Amino acid sequence: MAVVTLAEMMEAGAHFGHQTRRWNPKMSRYIYCARNGVHIIDLVQTAICMNNAYKWTRSAARSGKRFLFVGTKKQASEVIAQEAARCGAAYVNQRWLGGMLTNWTTMRARIDRLKDLERMEGSGSIAMRPKKEAAVLRRELDRLRKYLGGLKNMRRLPDVVILVDQRRETNAVLECRKLDIPLVSMLDTNCDPDLCDVPIPCNDDAVRSVQLVLSRLSDAINEGRHGVQDQRGNDDSEG
């Protein structure tokens, strides 16, 4: 059974690309046509790619790979946190800090600092500090939670990064390429498929489209790790 149906993708608006003047010619093989100055994504190609991405992600999860979900645009932020949490993956959904992967030693120290501050808050240690010092510590805690809260359980670099909006997350893409970390990417018509390993051509701006794709990838991770079939009963064997 298909991982996602054409009807589901149509309903989610996954077929709407960007204005034709903003396209990347490398995406031509995934484009069906142009209407009223907007490219329409070929959902048959999307379905094929989604099936491939599901199998690839499921296989990676089955072999014990660690995943990181990345998407900082407003319409993706909540979905990123929700679906990453559902499959036990780490996530970045507010801002990509430079060196988040390539300077992991420093980033790991900041995550440890976040955990220390949370322990201090939980024990009441911060509340017992002088008012000004407590305020400074709480501001630091709030900032670290905002940007690094989704990484608290990530002890090592991820093996796979799942990305929403390649153009916005350029720094994340470059860091992954530098470290040879495979990228599973939603690709709108202005993206470059050469900069990812597992492409999923679709609308990366619509919340429902993002939700549809990420929920399926989260299902794939859960199935790979726990052998749990999702609600669609996908039981395709590995290609």
Swiss-Prot record:
Gene3D superfamilies: Glucose-6-phosphate isomerase like protein, domain 1 (3.40.50.10490), Helix hairpin bin (1.10.287.610). Belongs to the universal ribosomal protein uS2 family. One of its GO terms (cellular component) is organellar chromatophore. One of its GO terms (biological process) is translation. The keyword Aminoacyl-tRNA synthetase does not apply. SUPFAM superfamilies: Ribosomal protein S2. Keywords: Organellar chromatophore, Plastid, Ribonucleoprotein, Ribosomal protein. It comes from the Eukaryota. InterPro entries: Ribosomal_uS2, Ribosomal_uS2_bac/mit/plastid, Ribosomal_uS2_CS, Ribosomal_uS2_flav_dom_sf. This is Small ribosomal subunit protein uS2c. Pfam families: Ribosomal_S2 (PF00318). Its main location: plastid. It is found in: Plastid, Organellar chromatophore. PROSITE patterns: RIBOSOMAL_S2_1. GO terms for molecular function: structural constituent of ribosome.
